[in-house]
Every structure is written in structure tokens, then in C-alpha cells.
Design a protein with these regions (language model features):
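Residue-level recognition of single "structural anchor" positions
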Residues: 1-341
Length: 341
């Protein structure tokens, strides 16, 4: 069953009621279904713990002054936009201010947590990307090129000069970019899934190790599975720990496949490639530049969760199923702190 814009405009309250309770009202505190109504059904009282709650209690719609039709319309646009929707565009569509639209979108994103676990049947590609301004457009780059060239620089050809510029300036500008760790499944019985994590610490090696092991090594292999989990990376030193991890039989836990990008080789010796993850990174850059123009480090993980939700749920079609819409009515308090791995 699909939900249309006409349904949202006419029966928003009934749609919300049906999706929130699914035919049976339950207390958000103790979970009891022994509930009686008050004020013509607008207020519910739990018979066990005496908690008073409404249909919007414990959701992102709690204490809102906007109509439910605008909220449902905002979620509809959020889900059906291929690369996301900016707060300015949403404000024009539902006739609210830009700050109100931004708050609505951020509340929606708080429901999009990542709970991705890869098992031994998956082939996982891991890579990192750095989101930020192009190194050639950074302030002071031309001055650095003029003053920072070594004497041997003038003996290099044009191609090697550009490589030297790029390498040296990346070292200076790396701290200004947002480092993102990406993991995507390349094969297996299930559909491809992706997990994106914002690296918000200078200790990147330790952070990457904890993040990878929490999603790939936390699920122990069955005893009858002798083949290690295959992980595909580039030649970066961030992933050397994969060759040192052992399982309960003191055997390598991972089959580490390396794509030598520095040698212009984009597939490992066994034919594995990380191009699917590179394609996902290109979509993130297009959203960052074309839709949102910019977002701060503070909310970087929320935007990454949004991208993962689109990728993992295949929201390319222009329709919203009731099951997808019901995910936003989970008991999430937007005023609580949101923590990420």
C-alpha cells in the first residue's frame, strides 16, 4: 500500500494514528496496552502506571506547533528526494520559515541511526574520504607554490610538479577537511548495504580500528565456517591491523585484499574492487555541493545517516510505503542527546 500527497492533505491525523499505534495503543513508558482515553481520545492514560500521553508523545512531533499534515508532507519530500532536500526548498514547499524547516529536517535525521553489521558471508570494501574545499582553491595556495618549492623542484617535469604540489598541500589542508570512513558490502545473499562514520578525532588509526572491528568482527564466525571474512581496502596504512587480527583458532580473521591505487591498479589480485564505495562517495560530494551547499562538522554524522538510509532502503522510486513512513514514528525524543559510534 502506498501513501499519496492527497491522502496526507485529507487524512493526516488518521494516517498518523494508524501508523503510530497500528491498531493498539500502548503506553510509551511501561508498554502496557491497558489504556483508557480522555478528552475525546486526544489524551491517553495508562491504567498500570497512570502515565498521561498523547499520540505524539515520545516522537519527533512532540510539543510541535505545526500541523501533522506539514510534518507528513516534509517526511514525504525528505524520502522521495533523490539526493536530499535543503531547508530553503522545504520552507518554500510547506510555507514555513527556513529556520523552522531546518529544525524539522534535523529532527527527522535523528531517527536515522545506523545499525549495520557485516557478517562472514559479506565482502566488505573499506575506504576513507575527505570532504571539504578543493585543495587548489584554498586561500594562500599560490603563495605556498611560489615560496615552498625546493631547488630540485625545477628539474621536475610538469606532471611531477603537480604531484608534488598536491602531496604537500594535502598535508597542510588535511586538518580542514572532514574525514569520513565508509564500509559497503560488495557481495553476499543480501542487498548491498553501506555504513558511514565521521572520524572526529586526530587519532585516526585507533578510531578506524574500533569502527571496523565493531561492525565486522563483533559477529563471531560459526565453527563450521573456515574461510575468513574478505575485506577490500587500498594501500593505506590505516588498515594494516586487518592482517594481525586472529580468530578463536589463531587463524587470520580477515582475508585482506589490497587495491594498489598508487600503482594505478583498481582491483586486487583476486579481482576485488572498491569502486562501489567510490561511487557512493561521489554521491555524497554531489549532495554536499549541489543540495546542501555546506554543512558543519557538528551535524556531519546526521547527514551521513541520511545518506545511508537512502542507500540501504533504495528510495529512488517516487513513492513512500507505509512501512518506511512508520520508521519515523519510533519513540525518539529529539531533545535528548544523540551519540554515535
Amino acid at each position: 500500500m502506498k501513501l499519496t500527497l492527497e491522502d496526507i492533505s485529507k487524512n493526516s491525523e488518521q494516517i498518523f494514528y494508524n501508523l503510530r499505534w497500528n491498531g493498539e495503543i500502548a503506553c510509551p513508558v511501561c508498554g502496557s496496552v491497558h489504556v483508557y482515553n480522555k478528552d475525546a481520545g486526544k489524551l491517553h492514560i495508562c491504567a498500570d502506571c497512570q502515565t498521561r500521553f498523547s499520540d505524539t508523545s515520545g516522537t519527533i512531533f512532540h510539543s510541535t506547533k505545526l500541523s501533522l499534515s506539514k510534518w507528513l508532507y516534509a517526511i514525504y519530500l525528505f524520502l522521495t528526494s533523490t539526493r536530499g532536500i535543503s531547508s530553503y526548498s522545504l520552507a518554500r514547499y510547506i510555507h514555513v520559515s527556513q529556520s523552522t524547516a531546518w529544525t524539522m529536517l534535523m529532527r527527522i535525521r535523528t531517527c536515522l541511526g545506523q545499525d549495520i553489521k557485516f557478517d562472514s558471508t559479506d565482502v566488505v570494501a573499506i575506504d576513507e574520504m575527505y570532504l571539504g574545499a578543493n585543495w587548489a582553491y584554498k586561500p594562500g595556495f599560490k603563495k605556498y607554490r611560489q615560496a615552498g618549492s625546493p631547488p630540485a623542484f625545477y628539474n621536475l617535469n610538469e606532471k611531477d610538479r603537480k604531484s608534488w604540489y598536491k602531496k604537500k598541500f594535502y598535508e597542510l589542508a588535511a586538518e580542514d577537511k572532514m574525514a569520513i570512513l565508509g564500509m559497503v558490502s560488495l557481495g553476499g545473499p543480501r542487498r548491498a548495504r553501506i555504513s558511514l562514520i565521521y572520524i572526529n578525532t586526530p587519532e585516526r588509526k585507533d578510531f578506524v580500528k574500533r569502527a571496523v572491528l565493531s561492525r565486522c568482527a563483533s559477529i563471531m564466525k560459526p565453527f563450521f565456517v573456515d574461510t575468513p571474512m574478505t575485506i577490500v581496502t587500498d594501500q593505506s596504512g590505516l588498515y594494516k591491523f586487518l592482517e594481525q587480527e586472529l580468530d578463536h583458532n589463531n587463524q587470520p580473521r580477515f582475508n585482506h585484499q589490497i587495491c594498489r591505487h598508487d600503482q594505478n591498479k583498481y582491483a586486487s589480485a583476486d579481482g576485488y574492487s572498491s569502486n562501489r564505495l567510490e561511487a557512493a562517495f561521489s554521491h555524497i560530494r554531489r549532495s554536499w555541493r549541489g543540495v546542501y551547499q555546506f554543512w558543519t562538522r557538528t551535524y556531519n554524522q546526521l547527514y551521513l545517516n541520511e545518506f545511508c538510509f537512502r542507500y540501504n532502503n533504495n528510495l529512488s522510486d517516487k513513492s513512500v510505503t507505509l512501512k518506511r513512513l512508520q520508521d519515523f514514528f519510533s519513540r525518539v525524543d529529539p531533545r535528548a542527546a544523540v551519540h554515535f559510534a
